[in-house]
């Protein structure tokens, strides 16, 4: 175990919007971390991110992972690179916080799970940051306390203001809805058993075959019900909401976080323009928690490789339903011992 005065040497792979934000948080807002390296094919952009911290710049993320200077890794590079980079971290036995999705397919994510199980200890955390958002945490605690009785219905909505052309209907599931899939699993604490997804195009600029508005209905292994609305071109701002209906009441994550101003016979409330602003605190808390666990010599306590894999299994079923127009069964999942909450794993 490390002393409290020591800091973890962290490298960040990918210095776009997400990676740049993580690097800034590590340098300015996570006292237990030292940002020692960043990697990006765009070394000029990486250099800009590294300038204030003096971090070493790499062009190749694999070289950063192999560097003796780097003790732990944050991956925020394009989705197809996630699984290969995480596997390299496992090969080098370095803790890694990987942005969602863990991989670009369930098959690729399963290989990560298999590699970590073979290693025999948990080193992977997946960036489902909503689990750290104070509002989501408050609702989770209310549900866990039994305040509304056992949950019977999950209702989630996820709306972006706008998006540039170039996305696909599948992208909406893998990149946006994946957060809501994880939220449903986290709040209800059951695996999703069946999904039925319908979509429509509300933004011709994206192409007629792109369904930017999607509605998922699902049932869980225990018979709970759920719905998820994803709208990536809402036109009015960024909004995420969750309502849990219990046997004796409901509890809700407020969709908007800004102050309500009442004046001149009207009330107004600011709506954020994107997820970085809405979940800024969650990203900081997530990173502080991850680094704190590493400093204590503990396995990351956040969403793990199994959560990343399970969410992608559901996402793949959603895509199949979207294409077929019919309900789709989700592959039955049984977590290995390493990921079971009811089993203490040592090593």
Curated annotation (Swiss-Prot):
GO terms for biological process: inositol catabolic process. It is an enzyme of class 1 (oxidoreductase). Its EC number is 1.1.1.18. InterPro entries: Gfo-Idh-MocA_inositol_DH, Gfo/Idh/MocA-like_OxRdtase_N, GFO_IDH_MocA-like_dom, MI/DCI_dehydrogenase, NAD(P)-bd_dom_sf. Keywords: NAD, Oxidoreductase. GO terms for molecular function: inositol 2-dehydrogenase (NAD+) activity; nucleotide binding. It catalyses: myo-inositol + NAD(+) = scyllo-inosose + NADH + H(+). Gene3D superfamilies: Dihydrodipicolinate Reductase, domain 2 (3.30.360.10), NAD(P)-binding Rossmann-like Domain (3.40.50.720). Homotetramer. Involved in the oxidation of myo-inositol (MI) to 2-keto-myo-inositol (2KMI or 2-inosose). HAMAP family: IolG (MF_01671). Belongs to the Gfo/Idh/MocA family. This is Inositol 2-dehydrogenase. It comes from Rubrobacter xylanophilus (strain DSM 9941 / JCM 11954 / NBRC 16129 / PRD-1).
């Amino acid at each position: 175990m490390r002393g409290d005065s020591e800091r973890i040497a962290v490298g960040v792979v990918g210095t776009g919007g997400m990676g740049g934000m993580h690097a800034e948080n590590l340098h300015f807002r996570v006292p237990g971390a030292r940002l020692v390296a960043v990697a990006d094919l765009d070394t000029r952009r990486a250099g800009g991110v590294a300038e204030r911290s003096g971090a070493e710049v790499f062009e190749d993320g694999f070289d950063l992972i192999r560097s003796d200077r780097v003790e732990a890794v944050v991956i925020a590079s394009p989705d197809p690179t996630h699984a290969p980079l995480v596997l390299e971290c496992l090969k080098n036995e370095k803790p890694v916080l990987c942005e969602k999705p863990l991989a670009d397919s369930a098959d690729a994510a399963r290989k990560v799970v298999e590699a970590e199980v073979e290693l025999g200890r948990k080193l992977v955390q997946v960036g489902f940051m909503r689990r750290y958002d104070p509002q989501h945490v408050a609702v989770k605690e209310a549900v866990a306390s039994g305040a509304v009785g056992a949950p019977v219905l999950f209702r989630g909505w996820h709306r972006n203001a706008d998006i540039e052309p170039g996305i696909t209907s599948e992208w909406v599931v893998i990149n946006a809805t994946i957060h809501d899939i994880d939220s449903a699993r986290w709040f209800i604490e059951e695996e999703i058993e069946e999904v039925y997804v319908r979509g429509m195009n509300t933004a011709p600029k994206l192409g007629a075959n792109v369904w930017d508005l999607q509605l998922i209905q699902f049932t869980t292994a225990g018979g709970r019900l759920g719905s998820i609305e994803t709208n990536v071109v809402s036109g009015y701002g960024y909004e995420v909401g969750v309502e849990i209906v219990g046997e004796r009441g409901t509890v809700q994550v407020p969709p908007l976080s800004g102050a309500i101003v009442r004046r001149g016979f009207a009330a107004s409330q600011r709506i954020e323009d994107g997820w970085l602003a809405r979940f800024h605190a969650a990203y900081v808390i997530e990173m502080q928690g991850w680094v704190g666990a590493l400093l204590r010599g503990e396995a990351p306590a956040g969403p793990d490789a199994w959560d990343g894999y399970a969410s992608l299994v559901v996402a793949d079923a959603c895509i199949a339903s979207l294409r077929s127009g019919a309900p789709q069964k989700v592959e039955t999942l049984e977590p290995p011992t390493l990921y079971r909450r009811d089993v203490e794993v040592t090593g």
